[in-house]
Structure formats: C-alpha cells, structure tokens
Amino acid sequence: MKSVLLTRNIQENNETIQEINKYNLDLRYIHCSLIKYKTLDFNINILNNYSNIIITSKYAAHILADYNLKQDIWVVGNKTKQLLGKKVIYTANNIADLIQHFPTDLYKHTIYLSSNEITQDLPNKIARHIIYNVEYLNELPISIIQEFENIRYFSKPAYRNAFKANTIRATTAYKKVFNDPSLGSTYPLEVPLGKMSIDFILLYSQNSAKTLVRLLLQNNLLQYLQDSLVIAISLKVANIVRPFIKNVVYCDNQSPHDIIKLLYENAKI
C-alpha cells in the first residue's frame, strides 16, 4: 500500500482525502499539518467603503460566509465560490488569472481580505485587510518522527526479517491506528511488511514547502525521502524542494484539483 503525506490543516487534509477517494486509490494517509489558522477580530463595517472584495483563500471565505455582503466578490477557486454564493462575479483559477481579468478602474474601490501570509501581492492601489493569521509548525509531531523511525528501522532487510520472526511483536505492535472508512486505512507499518516509505508528498504553498524542508533538515530526515515524489501546486513551490528531494512534479495552472490528478497518474503506476 502506497502512502501519502498530507501537509495542510486537518480539515483541508480530510477534504483532500475525500477528493482522492473519488479516484478509487488504495492509499495510506499520513497527517502532518504544517499550518494552522487563527481568526482575527474583524469589523465588517470597514467593507462599507468598498464596492468590490477580493478573496483568494477558502479560509477567508469561511469567515465571511455568514455575512450578508452587498459588494461584488472576486475569488480564486470553485470551493471559495461555493462558500460565498451568488455575489461572486468572477472565479479565477489562480491569483495571476484574477489580476489579469480584474478591471484597473476598480482598484481604488476594492479591498483584498487575506491572511498575514500571501504568495503574490496584488496591485498597490487595491486595499488589503488581514482577517486571519497563518502559523507554521515549529517542530515535527511525535507521530511523524515515529513514521520516520519506522522507515529507518525497516530500510534494512535484516531488521524486517527480525521483526517477522518475532511473533509476539508482529501481532501486538503496529496495529491499525485509524479506523474511519471515509478516510481510508492508516497504519504505522505497511501490510504485508516490506520496505517502508513515504511515497507521495502534497505541497500547496511556498511557505509550507519551506517549513517542511526546514523541519526535515533539523531532524536529519531528508535522506529517507529520496525515493518519494513531491507533488507541488506550482513551479515556485517545486523549486523550493528540488535542491533537497530529487523527484518533484508540479501543476501547470496552480489548481488544487490538479494536484490530485497528478497523484492519481503516479499512484496508479
């Protein structure tokens, strides 16, 4: 059974798993949430000064979904559009697409509601207001450290044979640790026992990629990912990890859905 390292927050990881399940792939999922979000106090009245709103993240859309917004809304991504409903007048594939189609005469009448971390600046005349903070992981969770310990231990055939020969250990340790059919099977070890690995790593932002590389370097773990395939949302994200991991592919149009397509194309091989 091949394994996938999921790097977004737990809610987004679970949504990703549901999308992957549509492709009927039998995968083991490893949760490593590199980011978490903190909603800030937000005075909705500041929007009264603007006729247009730009939203490029699903989390920002969640914050605004319960408000009766009167402005025209420009978004990135279909899921963001679904959260905000009929007031969305344009849905872009990515930020570059949105900027290309956004009328320049609306810049001074527009506010961009975002996090403290953005991957691409909008034109200067567009106002920006931060409505939530993105915080990145400072150390790897114990569960991820244990995952790499398993890879380290079972990378040597002699250790795998010793484990198989130990009947008590083989039957009592490393049992299934997650039993939710909607999320697929999660095992600390693959069954039947074989060489352990993390086969795929999904990366959705430059900051997540930088965080992952930093944590792997801190723990001297990059050597165990040289056979892994990183699937990045863009060329910029791919270029961050390429000096450290040799197998990297990326999406041409920066679409989260295309990450899953690339996963499917490589996992079925």
From Swiss-Prot:
Organism: Rickettsia prowazekii (strain Madrid E)
Annotated RPE1 insert domain residues: 152-197
Entries under InterPro entries matching the protein: 4pyrrol_syn_uPrphyn_synt_sf, RPE1
Identification of the protein by name: Uncharacterized protein RP474
Biological process annotations from GO: tetrapyrrole biosynthetic process
A GO molecular-function descriptor: uroporphyrinogen-III synthase activity
SUPFAM superfamilies linked: HemD-like
